Curated annotation (Swiss-Prot):
Recorded family membership: Belongs to the CarA family.
Catalytic activity: hydrogencarbonate + L-glutamine + 2 ATP + H2O = carbamoyl phosphate + L-glutamate + 2 ADP + phosphate + 2 H(+)
Region (CPSase): 1-195
CDD domains: GATase1_CPSase (cd01744)
Residues annotated as transmembrane: none
Protein name listed in UniProt: Carbamoyl phosphate synthase small chain
Species in which this protein is naturally found: Rubrivivax gelatinosus (strain NBRC 100245 / IL144)
């Protein structure tokens, strides 16, 4: 006999509602509802700190086929506020699976809903833009009526807007730590960096573990520092290069990070930024950012390298972008999105610093743009 799952409700701030079944923890959650078009990598997506306070809708219909393991995580816990999917398979099939997705969600306290029309939801978000929502997981046997729906819509309306939210310090580490773990290989698992050629200080605005692994793969001993670390403390560590990580929220309120990045870049330290780090570098260089209608979330985004003409398929996860009209003479565009023409990469014309809006570390997604890590290493070699 198939299990009878408790009812669940997704309500958007505009009053749009979806009834489904609960596949995670009981309770209620609110956040900005976004859609991600990746076919795989749900575990990496859930644990990506960049999804803090966001409810993630996965557009691929079957989610959970390969279960969950203890290695493919980008942080120590789930950071997404909630999960929305179409169908949860009843049988898990993968030799690395440690547990089903539903069990993992329950363990992590993540509220999730399945059995809704995710295509309709995605069309709503595409038309109206990302908006706040509320998922409620009810007790078994609950009849979801007008009162329950009204309460969920009210909760969605009351949730704070992502614009103006500084979430980097919410997800950042509390204290510095060292990172030497390298990428996973079949039959070995994760390795450990043996001989380091460079010392990189990585700002943790919500850093993904695979970024740190790819730096370690290239001979970098990484010291990860909290988001609010002043530049003076970084200089004491005598880094060969500084990395500005990905992260959630609006970059403009992160004045502490912008000030530190400006000081580090002006000092001539080789600097590489990704995602939120890209936006912080742009703000530190005098440019402005803006909130996008529904952002870029997926693993199939084509991006053009303006220097080489090469087109790469990239992983993306951001709701803000750099305004090209605000670039000064000290910044030049290096990459653009072929979906909407938004800026995807920048380089300083007067300092050894560059940044990329997407995710060259993938996890999940393609590795086409991974050469940017090699470019960072080359910058450090030039300055050695």
């Amino acid at each position: 006999m198939l299990p009878v799952l408790p009812p669940a409700l997704l309500a958007l701030a505009d009053g749009t509602t979806f009834l489904g079944t609960s596949i995670g923890a009981p309770g209620r959650t609110v956040g900005e509802v976004v859609f991600n078009t990746a076919l795989t990598g749900y575990q990496e997506i859930l644990t990506d700190p960049s999804y803090c306070r966001q409810i993630v809708t996965l557009t691929y219909p079957h989610i959970g086929n390969v279960g969950v393991n203890e290695e493919d995580v980008e942080a120590a816990k789930v950071h997404a506020a909630g999960l929305v999917i179409k169908d949860l398979p009843l049988r898990v099939s993968n030799f690395r699976a440690a547990m089903p997705l539903s069990q993992y969600l329950e363990r992590e306290g993540t509220v999730a809903i399945a059995g809704i029309d995710t295509r309709r939801l995605t069309r709503v978000l595409r038309t109206t833009g990302a908006q706040n929502g509320c998922i409620v997981s009810f007790a078994p046997g609950t009849v979801v009526g007008e009162a329950e729906i009204a309460a969920a819509v009210a909760a969605a309306k009351a949730a704070p807007s992502m614009a103006g939210l500084d979430l980097a310090q919410v997800v950042s580490a509390d204290a510095p730590y060292e990172w030497t773990e390298t990428s996973w290989q079949l039959g070995r698992g994760h390795g450990t960096l043996a001989d380091a050629e460079f010392h990189v200080v990585a700002y943790d605005f919500g850093v993904k573990r695979n970024i740190l692994r790819l730096l370690a793969d290239r001979g970098c001993r990484v010291t990860v520092v909290p988001a609010r670390t002043p530049a003076a403390e970084v200089f004491k560590l005598k880094p060969d290069g500084v990395f500005l990580s990905n992260g959630p929220g609006d970059p403009e309120p992160c004045d502490y990070a912008i000030a530190a990045a400006r000081e580090i870049i002006d000092a001539g330290v080789p600097t590489f930024g990704i995602c939120l780090g890209h936006q912080i570098m742009a703000l530190a260089s005098g440019a402005k950012t803006f909130k996008m209608k529904f952002g870029h979330h997926g693993a199939n985004h084509p991006v053009k390298d303006l220097d080489s003409g090469r087109v790469s398929i990239t992983s993306q996860n951001h709701g803000f972008a750099v305004d090209e009209k605000t670039l000064g003479a000290n910044l030049r565009p290096t990459h653009v999105s072929l979906f909407d023409g938004t800026l995807q990469g920048l380089a300083r014309t007067d300092r050894p610093a560059f940044c990329f809006q997407g995710h060259p570390e993938a996890s999940p997604g393609p590795h086409d743009i991974g050469y940017l890590f090699d470019r960072f290493v080359a910058l450090m070699q030039e300055r050695a």
